[in-house]
Amino acid sequence: MQKNKKVYPRYIKRLLDIVLSIIAIILLSPIYIVVSILVLIFMGWPILFKQPRPGKNEKIFNMYKFRTMTNKKNKDGVLLSDEERINKFGKFLRTTSLDELPELFCILTGKMSIVGPRPLVVSYLPYYNDREKHRHDVKPGLTGLAQINGRNTLQWEERFEYDIEYVNNVSFKMDLKIIIYTIKKVFKREDIVLSGTGKIENFNIYRKKQLEKNNK
């Protein structure tokens, strides 16, 4: 049984990632074109947002999304806060998860998988405990177990527990379940809290507060 469990993540999962990402990119190509034009109109250039993220074994890669913020600056030429730069169209892209469509190309190139722990920002790396670091034992995903169990309405510890549960139990059955539930949640727009609006505390700040509290 243990041998069968290893066959899927080592060989079959990558094959499915390639096949499904190619199919999705082809089928969604009209949406890519329309969203690209609208981003250019409402956000300006560039169309894509690029940011380094930790992948499997904490290896850094560039993750791409459609831009959801403008380049608005104050009178001194400094960018306004994230909350002030997210317009209605940007919020629409985030709540519908359309901003994440370019990640399919990261899946195709092998940097990500369709299912896995979500890739978080590089600045969080020093703040994971030994258990939480295991979320990087597999490739990050477009969606994951945490995304179908509360998404970013969860506390950080809860999210990481779901990530670790996935890492320890990855299987075709689990991936299929996560994909099906993700599609349902996207259409229902459930469990969505916009990052960059002050409603979600960054993990590094959250963990710093915990450490300071424990050291008192």
State the predicted function of each range.
Residues 1-12, 157-173:
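Compositionally biased, charge-rich terminal segments
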Residues 2-71, 178-216:
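A hydrophobic, helix-centered structural microdomain
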Residues 10, 14, 61, 84-87, ...:
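Generic recognition of short, well-ordered alpha-helical interface segments
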Residues 21, 36, 49, 87-91, ...:
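Positions in alpha-helical segments
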Residues 35, 49-50, 78, 115-117, ...:
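Short, hydrophobic secondary-structure boundary micro-motifs
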Residues 49-85, 143-161:
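Short, glycine-rich, amphipathic interfacial segments at transmembrane boundaries or analogous
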Residues 82-139, 179-182:
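A short, structured surface patch at a secondary-structure boundary
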Residues 148-153, 162, 168-170, 179-184:
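Soluble extracytoplasmic domains of inner/organellar membrane proteins
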